[in-house]
Amino acid sequence: MSFTVTQYILFLFSFFAVGGAMSLAAYRDDRTASFVGSVFAGLGSLAGLCAGIAAIVAPQATTYSIATMFPFLTLSIHIDKLAGIFLTIISLVAFLATVYGYGYMRHYFGKYNIGAFYFFYNLFLGSMMLVTLANHALFFLVAWELMSLASYFLVVFDHKEH
């Protein structure tokens, strides 16, 4: 079965959205939240890797747009060969960080909200990939701000003094 670049992109954002929501919903059980958040972050990263490689070998660029009720905000993504290269690099690093982070987060079990961490982690990965794909200036800025806010919450996650 062969998928198009657009289908890989839809899988990518679906995995990150579901992973973030499910890990946040499982916030009371650290093991479940960590497992679900990591699995969906890994699947989203693999979908991004497939989308990036498919875009690199595709003969032409792909554009996908969704109309909104705001005339100045078009949800439009565009993936050409350059975006495919960046998406491939980001996805590969994200996948490796997810695999490493799954074991690393065990020592935070019972100390912090692991579900919230994986919510922001999935949001960060999805918005970082969205920055490379945004085809509209305002949409790019929204994705950039989502990425910035998610990274802030990831940085302050370990906020207790040791």
PLM region descriptions:
Residues 1-8, 21-119:
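Transmembrane helix-loop-helix hairpins at membrane boundaries of multipass inner-membrane proteins
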Residues 15-19, 44-47, 90-100, 122-125, ...:
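Membrane-embedded alpha-helical core segments of multi-pass
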Residues 31, 116-162:
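Alpha-helical multi-pass transmembrane bundles of energy-transducing inner-membrane proteins
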